[in-house]
């Protein structure tokens, strides 16, 4: 497969709280992160999320409160979903 990613991914396993407008709060685990986005492990992600869908997320379990970020669904894999960070308008 041709890798067209602009930013290098780094392994990172942390808890991420997703606040979804339809499904409510979901606690998921990240697999890796880059400057532009994050991959999260979600069982049956295709049945819960759609490409282009935007929602917020916040890393959990840090010594200080993490910022809430806007995330957009950009790709699916059998193990989860790729999300990109959205800039606030």
Model regions and ranges:
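Structured alpha-helical
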Residues: 1-89
């Amino acid at each position: 497969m041709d890798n067209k990613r602009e930013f290098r991914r780094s392994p990172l396993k942390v808890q991420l709280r997703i606040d979804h407008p339809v499904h409510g709060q979901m606690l998921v685990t990240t697999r890796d992160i880059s400057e532009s986005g994050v991959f999260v492990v979600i069982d049956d992600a295709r049945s819960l999320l759609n490409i282009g869908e935007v929602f917020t997320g916040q890393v959990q379990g840090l010594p200080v409160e993490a910022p809430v970020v806007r995330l957009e669904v950009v790709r699916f894999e059998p193990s989860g979903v790729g999300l990109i960070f959205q800039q606030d308008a």
